[in-house]
């Protein structure tokens, strides 16, 4: 089906609501948009609908994760990851959050491992994995990035990223005071 997308060149500030058919088609095929701008406008409209209680957060989450598979603009990736995090923590029903967080972190881990080496997107995805890791596989990957036993080609694990990885491990219950003290002694900044 076709997607009727108003303000597709983003020439004005407007809150755009899509018709039901355009919304359904756009969300289902968001990763088929050839350009970042129309995809971003569609997702911004969907996000407004989530915030207004007109679209289930789960539908936005699925579309945002699909868009992250194809998005190449760093600023758009950053915004999508922020909305994904907010969606998981504030807009999904409490009963769905645990499962959704684990599934989202799995997707983010896959994307981080496949991201272009050394790019902003790779770094943003690695940070997002650390922030959402909850399963054994996810926390094992974060711990391996931190200790260097697994590397993502091109990812520089500097002191700032080390802290983000460790914070994620602490939040997931995989690290604690001992690891924090060790990192403090390692941090010469």
PLM features: residue spans?
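Non-catalytic accessory/interaction domains
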Residues: 1-189
């Amino acid at each position: 089906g076709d997607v009727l997308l108003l303000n597709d060149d983003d020439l004005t500030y407007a809150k755009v609501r899509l018709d039901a058919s355009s919304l359904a088609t756009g969300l289902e095929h968001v990763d088929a948009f050839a350009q970042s701008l129309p995809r971003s406008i569609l997702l911004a409209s969907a996000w407004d609908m989530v915030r207004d209680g007109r679209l289930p957060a789960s539908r936005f989450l699925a579309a945002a994760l699909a868009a992250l598979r194809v998005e190449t603009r760093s600023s758009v990736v950053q915004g999508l990851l922020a909305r994904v995090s907010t969606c998981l923590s504030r807009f999904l029903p409490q009963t769905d959050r645990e499962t959704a967080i684990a599934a989202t972190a799995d997707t983010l881990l896959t994307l981080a491992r496949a991201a272009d080496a050394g790019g902003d997107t790779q770094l943003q995805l690695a940070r997002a994995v650390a922030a959402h890791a909850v399963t054994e596989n996810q926390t094992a990957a974060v711990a391996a990035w931190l200790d260097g036993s697994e590397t993502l080609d091109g990812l520089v694990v500097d002191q700032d990223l080390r802290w983000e990885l460790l914070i994620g491990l602490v939040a997931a219950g995989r690290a604690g005071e001992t690891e924090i003290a060790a990192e403090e002694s390692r941090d010469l900044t």
